[in-house]
Amino acid sequence: MRLFPIRSFRRHAAVSGALAAVVIAASCETVPYTGRSQLQIMSSAQESQMGVQAFQQTLAKSQLSGNVAASEMVTRVGSRIAAVTGHPEYQWEYRLIQDDKQANAFALPGGKVAVYTGILPITRDESGLAAVLGHEIGHVVARHGGERVSQQMLVNIGLETAMASLSAGNPATVQAVASLLGAGATVGVLLPWSRAQESEADHLGLILMAKAGYDPHAARDLWVRMAAASQGSGRPPEFLSTHPSEPTRIQQIEVWLPEAMQYYRPR
């Protein structure tokens, strides 16, 4: 049984493909250090504005830590790394959020950086924190936020084309196929790209922390501790995860360490 008219599908696919090709050709940029070509439909200013809004929303529902020494450490380490990014135009901000159950940190477009107190026992010292912030600021340097928005826009074009082609079919069939298309886009396109971005942020993070005067070997040690902390956490398999597994990260870091050490100058 035919689910949708072949001619209609081909027509929509041709239009969608042509539009996507034009967008990609006009919106390619190169990631610093890695040299990877990436799709960037939105401007850096637009991306930064999104980061500012998200940062404000997060802080509005969070409690900042009262630990002055730890907060100063976050600012000190973050500032050293930010100074070597080549982005003085960003309005860099650093916050330590009080949440001992959250072993996490993030950096948003425009230079908005936050660390949760729950990750400090794992980072242990400034070098460990530099490994975390180098990774998070690596996302900012590589403009991964804008890239993910751009990728989602292309995925939406593809899904809309497929749904338009299915519109003449049985409603129940259309709904079932639409669900499969959405799942396929998530597993087959968005998550793999996210894992690639996470790995790239690891790569960039090593270089950034080294340029800031932190020994990049601390990143390997950090992920060994992170692997121990995550055992028994019930995390999803790597195939369905937006982050590479800790063993994969450690192996990749070992490969990148010689390159990062070329940038390392102890302070």
Functional labels for PLM-detected ranges:
Residues L3, H12-S16, V23, C28-R267:
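A Zn2+-metalloprotease active-site environment signal
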